[in-house]
Amino acid sequence: MLLGASLVGALLFSKLVLKLPWTQVGFSLLLLYLGSGGWRFIRVFIKTVRRDIFGGMVLLKVKTKVRRYLQERKTVPLLFASMVQRHPDKTALIFEGTDTHWTFRQLDEYSSSVANFLQARGLASGNVVALFMENRNEFVGLWLGMAKLGVEAALINTNLRRDALRHCLDTSKARALIFGSEMASAICEIHASLEPTLSLFCSGSWEPSTVPVSTEHLDPLLEDAPKHLPSHPDKGFTDKLFYIYTSGTTGLPKAAIVVHSRYYRMASLVYYGFRMRPDDIVYDCLPLYHSAGNIVGIGQCLLHGMTVVIRKKFSASRFWDDCIKYNCTIVQYIGELCRYLLNQPPREAESRHKVRMALGNGLRQSIWTDFSSRFHIPQVAEFYGATECNCSLGNFDSRVGACGFNSRILSFVYPIRLVRVNEDTMELIRGPDGVCIPCQPGQPGQLVGRIIQQDPLRRFDGYLNQGANNKKIANDVFKKGDQAYLTGDVLVMDELGYLYFRDRTGDTFRWKGENVSTTEVEGTLSRLLHMADVAVYGVEVPGTEGRAGMAAVASPISNCDLESFAQTLKKELPLYARPIFLRFLPELHKTGTFKFQKTELRKEGFDPSVVKDPLFYLDARKGCYVALDQEAYTRIQAGEEKL
């Protein structure tokens, strides 16, 4: 900004005051520019101009369409109707579990029967119906049918039980609950504590003895319902579509609000940014109660006319066979799925598929190249985003390890920023003017996005709980008087504007005066331990500053040569990042999106009287890992053992 002002000032002075000819003015400005470090600007411009222009065009296209749909009061069901009209007999959804194919017309008719049935039962626009069901075609038809009536679906995580499940139902204020027959036992566990006015419907196989007494079998009721479209509700593009619950890794799940424009924006930025085509076939094995599976995946069917193959759950052994069977051209991934695939023994199917793109987020940089080269996937379409965030990113040119970019030349076009935070408390650091301090290239910081409620691409729809909203909004971030969304994620930007994920706030811990990135350490340890699941976290040790690193490894101790492992770590990780404690256990508990649940692991710590799994600690004198028994634990607690 200062350089630009200086150049403009020099231009005016040279031309208006000195009255120099344009050739001399231009030469003078060039000298001033290069003398001010402008050659870096030129280098960045040359290397990023094509990327930035393409990204800007994608942003402009989506923004233009969103504004048009706002004026026309479009909704997701209305946009889907245009797809049905365009190709009614094209396959829309395929459920791998039963090899069931639904055309766009069939999906349209099923969802209309849902809308008519709910309307006949007294539900109306603005009411909420909870949906608790594993992946299948009906899942999509049910929430889409609710949306046709203006009813808002609360999409419940199928891994939730008891208190967490009850919490989600209570906070949604649902008037009805539709659950899959496979979830009947979970509903029976909490049935006594549910509101007596809550209507219960079961979809799938019907066995009256396995469901609460008041439950009705939904499937025959839908067959009898009219299949014509009910009257369109008075809803627009910024009205609520459904609710998606956060994973709940740090507490009870929160209901994030998804409005129609957000659904469109998330699906379409991916569609245009990664150059998808209507004839692509998407393999979606991600849970449909989360945005990656339901918006990024299913959204390509509803909004752009693609065929989507739905799988109940991810299977590493069946992944490529499914892709071949259904001629998939795009596969979705999240979190650790790519590592699970790499961990499979080589097979013929992994080179006979037609997949041209892997679409998702969370692919570790350490296995990125191995994944794309082994499975012959030309394009890794990595993106960054959360259901509720207003600062999504896309790695449109497959930069290895990057989750997206922001223009260094025209950064104001997409108002996101990395801001400095306190390394211990993760609180925002502000300058003398009270405004957050932006990070320089190479400097880690929290990603924030400026909130502009009038702009559908910049608005923050938040959560049902206002208290949760307050924790995600900061004031005076870009300038005085503004507001910004706090992602809670630490990223770092390189000189060209590419952004790399570092850590989620709370996942970084400090040891020996240094910050330890759990994400980086987990990636290294997993690679060294034959792609085993590894969760890294900090534990408190009496008499020491910070937290000592501990790694929980989902692998038998017999699979690890501890002496060799310790020696290899010396080459792979700096001293402060090497885990002090190791815990070997049968499996690590994960969320539905494959995030490790570390809360209980932290609580249990390294106390052998609490943890019954094999424990080891890094003996500083011997330079290797030794068994951590009660005697060693006592010495560590007393400060007699040097760590």
Swiss-Prot record:
PROSITE patterns per the record? AMP_BINDING (PS00455)
UniProt note on tissues of expression = Most abundantly expressed in small intestine, brain, kidney, liver, skin and heart. In small intestine, expressed at high levels on the apical side of mature enterocytes. Highly expressed by the epithelial cells of the visceral endoderm and localized to the brush-border membrane of extraembryonic endodermal cells (at protein level). Expressed in the retinal pigment epithelium and in the retina (at protein level). Expressed in the retinal pigment epithelium and in the retina.
Q: What does the entry list under GO cellular component?
A: brush border membrane; endoplasmic reticulum; endoplasmic reticulum membrane; microvillus; plasma membrane
Q: What keywords would UniProt list here? A: Endoplasmic reticulum, Fatty acid metabolism, Ligase, Lipid metabolism, Lipid transport, Membrane, Nucleotide-binding, Transmembrane, Transmembrane helix, Transport
Q: Identify the main location.
A: endoplasmic reticulum
Q: Which InterPro entries match?
A: AMP-bd_C (IPR025110), AMP-bd_C_sf (IPR045851), AMP-binding_CS (IPR020845), AMP-dep_synth/lig_dom (IPR000873), ANL_N_sf (IPR042099), Lipocalin_CS (IPR022272)
TM regions (residue ranges): 20-42, 139-156
State which Enzyme Commission number(s) the record gives: 6.2.1.15, 6.2.1.3, 6.2.1.-
Q: Does the keyword Metal-binding apply?
A: no
Which residues are listed for AMP binding in this entry? Answer: Y243, I244, Y245, T246, S247, G248, T249, T250, G251, L252, P253, K254
Enzyme class per UniProt: ligase
Swiss-Prot/TrEMBL catalytic activity: a fatty acid(in) = a fatty acid(out); (9Z,12Z)-octadecadienoate(out) = (9Z,12Z)-octadecadienoate(in); (9Z)-octadecenoate(out) = (9Z)-octadecenoate(in); hexadecanoate(out) = hexadecanoate(in)
**Molecular function GO labels:** arachidonate-CoA ligase activity; long-chain fatty acid transmembrane transporter activity; long-chain fatty acid-CoA ligase activity; nucleotide binding; oleoyl-CoA ligase activity; palmitoyl-CoA ligase activity; very long-chain fatty acid-CoA ligase activity
Q: Known SUPFAM superfamilies for this protein?
A: Acetyl-CoA synthetase-like
Write down the superkingdom of origin.
Eukaryota
Pathological association:
Defects in Slc27a4 are the cause of wrinkle-free (wrfr) phenotype. It is a spontaneous, autosomal recessive mutation resulting in very tight, thick skin and is secondary characterized by severe breathing difficulties. Mice die shortly after birth. This phenotype is similar to human restrictive dermopathy, a very rare human genetic disorder.
Give any extra note attached to this record. Answer: Slc27a4 deficient mice display features of a neonatally lethal restrictive dermopathy. Their skin is characterized by hyperproliferative hyperkeratosis with a disturbed epidermal barrier, a flat dermal-epidermal junction, a reduced number of pilo-sebaceous structures, and a compact dermis. The rigid skin consistency results in an altered body shape with facial dysmorphia, generalized joint flexion contractures and impaired movement including suckling and breathing deficiencies.
Known role: Mediates the import of long-chain fatty acids (LCFA) into the cell by facilitating their transport across cell membranes. Appears to be the principal fatty acid transporter in small intestinal enterocytes. Also functions as an acyl-CoA ligase catalyzing the ATP-dependent formation of fatty acyl-CoA using LCFA and very-long-chain fatty acids (VLCFA) as substrates, which prevents fatty acid efflux from cells and might drive more fatty acid uptake. Plays a role in the formation of the epidermal barrier. Required for fat absorption in early embryogenesis.
Family statement drawn from the similarity comment of this UniProt entry: Belongs to the ATP-dependent AMP-binding enzyme family.
What is this protein called in UniProt?
Answer: Long-chain fatty acid transport protein 4
Q: What is the lineage of its organism?
A: Eukaryota, Metazoa, Chordata, Craniata, Vertebrata
